[in-house]
Amino acid sequence: MRYLTAGESHGPKLVGILEGVPSGAKIDKETIDQALQERQKGPGRGGRMKIEKDQVTILSGVRGGLTTGAPIALEIINRDWANWEKIMAWGDEADLESRKVITPRPGHADLTGHLKYRTEVRNVLERASARETAMRVAIGNIAVQILEALGVEIRGQVLSVGKVHMNSEDTPEYWQRVQASEWKVGDPQGEEALYTQLQEARSKGESLGGVLQIQVQNLLPGLGSYVQWDRKLDGRLAQAVLSVQAIKGVAFGMGFAAGQHFGSEVHDPIGYDSGRGYYRYSNNAGGIEGGMTNGEPVIIEAVMKPIPTLYSPLSTVNLETKEVMEASVERSDVCAVPAALVVLKHVAAWEILQAILEKFPADTWDELDKAWHDYKRFVSER
């Protein structure tokens, strides 16, 4: 499978094309739209989210609610385009002077993109914007729906925002609280502190980052491979996660803490049960060993830096005069950590489904479903 996205933050549309999705898989448009709406939520979101009402239009590759095997084309309308139509026009009528950016923002693609492509900063930030992730959520939700049909569940939580850290549990009641929370946390006291911290950041013209966790449940062992570097599933998941705007680090299972312990304290002892097959007594590896799933939940943690647009701007250099000035200010969020969690779940889903289709090549849903359950039976009896 593969996909491409196109579109600018303030252009007319975001578009995406997926190829390699088996035919006969059930796809529900409303479920995609619900994921897009989740991405727009969060206490720290900016004014743009009051304008956009993201919904996907499926242009091809799905008929009667089932994939056809043909490329799937998607589009999402940018409602804010109405306010930028003259500025972002493709032809000679484009107003290139309005909203021109000559003071690049530290931490953003502005300056480096300007130098690399020898183009205006406006052109750089329009494509580099996290607005692009709306289409990646739509694309990834197709993978989510196929994974759920196989019994694979992807869930996530926010572990910290700024200096506020959550107390995490692993109970059904805890995950219900996470799902109901605006912040996607299950710690009520910690959540109160998040609102206080958000207000402080907003009043100071600051932004906030955080740490997020994704869990992929009910995967079979053997997805990915150890035989070549580019087939290792943790490497591919790491690339997918780090490709999301503002994500600066990724870890699996125990992560960086593994470097502070003896091997006997890190590696997960193996057990066997006639009903479930092989299993681990712990999951410090985060469900991946040797670049392959081992049957335990895949646990991914990622760190999101604070958004680089600051309403109390840092210093920068004027591209025309070379004078030191304040960086430009674009409309932005104070905190988008819960929204990033939605994006990470969907980019991870795409990589997981791709690994499944490499293990079980299939042109149709029925072939994939049969191969998955045949292998599941083999693993449990081995």
UniProtKB/Swiss-Prot annotation:
GO cellular component, one term: cytosol
Keyword Lyase among record annotations: yes
Cofactor: FMNH2
Keyword Flavoprotein: yes
Pathway where this protein functions: Metabolic intermediate biosynthesis; chorismate biosynthesis; chorismate from D-erythrose 4-phosphate and phosphoenolpyruvate: step 7/7
Enzyme superclass (EC): lyase
Domain of life per record: Bacteria
Catalyses which reaction(s): 5-O-(1-carboxyvinyl)-3-phosphoshikimate = chorismate + phosphate
Sequence positions that bind NADP(+): 39, 45
Listed EC numbers: 4.2.3.5
Subunit structure: Homotetramer.
Family per record: Belongs to the chorismate synthase family.
Function: This reaction introduces a second double bond into the aromatic ring system.
Protein name: Chorismate synthase
Organism annotation: Desulfitobacterium hafniense (strain Y51)
